[in-house]
Curated annotation (Swiss-Prot):
Family that this chain belongs to: Belongs to the universal ribosomal protein uS10 family.
Subunit structure: Component of the mitochondrial ribosome small subunit.
InterPro entries, alphabetized: Ribosomal_uS10, Ribosomal_uS10_dom, Ribosomal_uS10_dom_sf
Major site of localization recorded for this protein: mitochondrion
Compartments, as annotated in UniProt: Mitochondrion
Organism listed in the record: Arabidopsis thaliana (Mouse-ear cress)
Transit peptide location on this chain: 1-54
Protein name: Small ribosomal subunit protein uS10m
Annotated GO biological process: translation
């Protein structure tokens, strides 16, 4: 530990600084040697105490060097840390890189299992594959569009009625036979506002209903004769109020 007091009254001269540093260095080099474990330097430097000079006063400067560390024979110092030889061997073994020669090649069964796992990673149900459900409808004849296989095929809504009748002629009178009748709807009426048309058309295309008939209804309150205006629109219905 070096303790000193530096006081500055004005700008020092070069000769004053060089003389002070030279005497300080000579004192330290004279009293300190590599073999010494402790040294005490007590010196006082008194320079010109005029207001235009630089004054250095080092009072009771104590310099203590720590004892040299004794290194055992089996330990080699590397920087600030010490590592034993056994530890070095362990580190070398841990840093061995796995080369392709050390890796066991996969069997055909393992490769096939990895491929199946990669294919089925997008689905939780075994055997199903998720595909893109939405495709372009620019030219449906050129590009066939289908729903994903895990969803049911959507068509026009229908009603199913299940009948249970007796089988006749038959020996066993308790015999029954079941059949069902399906009534498919040919028309699907969807009522939508103007801001809902795009959403309704999207779902119609998604359910593979590529044909649609639009019916425009105009409701207005006026005293003017609108027959000529509405007559230009084919298939429109006139509601007069």
């Amino acid at each position: 530990m070096i303790a000193g007091v530096l006081r500055r009254s004005s700008l020092p001269s070069r000769q004053t600084l060089s003389a002070a540093l030279a005497s300080f260095n000579s004192c330290i080099s004279h009293n300190l040697t590599p073999a010494t474990t402790g040294a005490s330097v007590s010196s006082r430097f008194t320079l010109a105490s005029s207001p235009n000079s630089f004054g250095i006063r080092a009072r009771n400067i104590h310099i203590r060097s720590e004892p040299s560390m004794i290194v055992p024979a089996g330990i080699a110092s590397q920087g600030y840390a010490t590592v034993t030889k056994d530890r070095k061997n362990e580190i070398k073994k841990a840093k061995i890189k796995i080369s392709p020669d050390n890796v066991r090649p996969l069997s055909r069964k393992e490769i096939a299992l990895q491929k199946e796992a990669a294919e089925e990673s997008t689905s939780k149900i075994k055997g199903t594959k998720i595909c893109i459900a939405i495709r372009s409808f620019v030219n449906p004849e050129k590009q066939a569009w289908c729903l994903p296989p895990h969803t049911r095929k959507v068509a026009m809504p229908d009603t199913r009625t299940l009948y249970t009748v007796l089988r006749s002629p038959h020996v066993d009178k308790k015999s029954r036979e079941q059949f069902e009748m399906r009534f498919k709807k040919r028309f699907l009426v969807i009522k939508a506002q103007s801001h809902e048309l795009s959403k309704k058309l999207f779902w119609l295309k998604r359910y593979r209903i590529l044909g649609a008939q639009y019916e425009l209804q105009f409701h207005c309150k006026t005293r003017l004769d609108m027959t000529q205006v509405l007559g230009n629109i084919n298939g429109s219905t006139t509601n007069a109020y």
